[in-house]
């Protein structure tokens, strides 16, 4: 193992670990930075269940008490994000093996991690390895550093790849939500063992109105160390929305057409309201791509179930700040959080003279009822434990005045001044195109947003 004089780098720590120098003395995170996400706007892969699955047996060993664990840096040691990565799971579970608070996938010495492909594995199958190409689940065992053992052979963790991208699904469940007006969907992976579903998020969606009320998932302290450079995908219908061309509905051409029809004017007369720079509606992620750690998790965010029309100036402005600051807060206090991200209401579009304000939808049904509403508000609820939480809200209307915001968009008492970690939350009265933010108590918020689970009414403490 090579060492260099640049001893402060974390790369050197990996090499030191490979020669068994005590983990508790040298383990650190110097030089590592949480990645700032790019703007997320964009077809998922259809999910099929593989048949004829072969599972490699679990290998049991006795770990040496003084042997350090294998440490996989989620930002450096995983396969490149353009390569088809497997799922990284805790053995015989439906849970991802998530990184520790410093962003390392930590596997105890002698223990196994479960890797899952929906097709064949690359590199590890064939007559020379004794592993069938029908194998869909393998359980390599930690040796040291980033080196693992499988069927008697040694591999670097980056070598474990699938021959094709792991396929995920969006499944409609039998459960309803939003007071029985909407349907609960789950997003994730059907693992080949019967009954195992690895969920990345679940979604409360109104099929009739094409509105997602909320997306629920978990943030962990290691979420700030999400895998960087995962390619953005085109948003997918994920085998749903069969009656609609969702890409066309979100197109800027359709936005201008619907706005012109709404205000009874020509598209050319809407330059004050819509342009191609930042005054247009993007496919706004609810669960952000960067809220997910592994590439396989991040790709599941590119479904229209996890999107709503969001003004780009807000998407890349104040709302991006909310996403970043929440991840940073969770990392700082080293506690996991349940996260609900959703939308409320319908934004009203103004005429040029501001005398007319009408609800803005990107589609309509046969009876001209509005579908795919442009939300008035985006919100993110974070809950820690049973009773502590907070709601962060953002106004999705770059044309609203301060007066309109205070009278129409602030739907619960603003408590941001009571929360020290929200000191970054500021609004510039002269420039509200990036968005207007405020914060509320969870139990007060759900009184005006009944689509949320009733148990959130028990969250009565502010998350300080």
What are these regions, as identified by a protein language model?
Residues 3-4, 10-464:
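Domain-level detector for secreted/extracellular nuclease and nuclease-toxin modules, and
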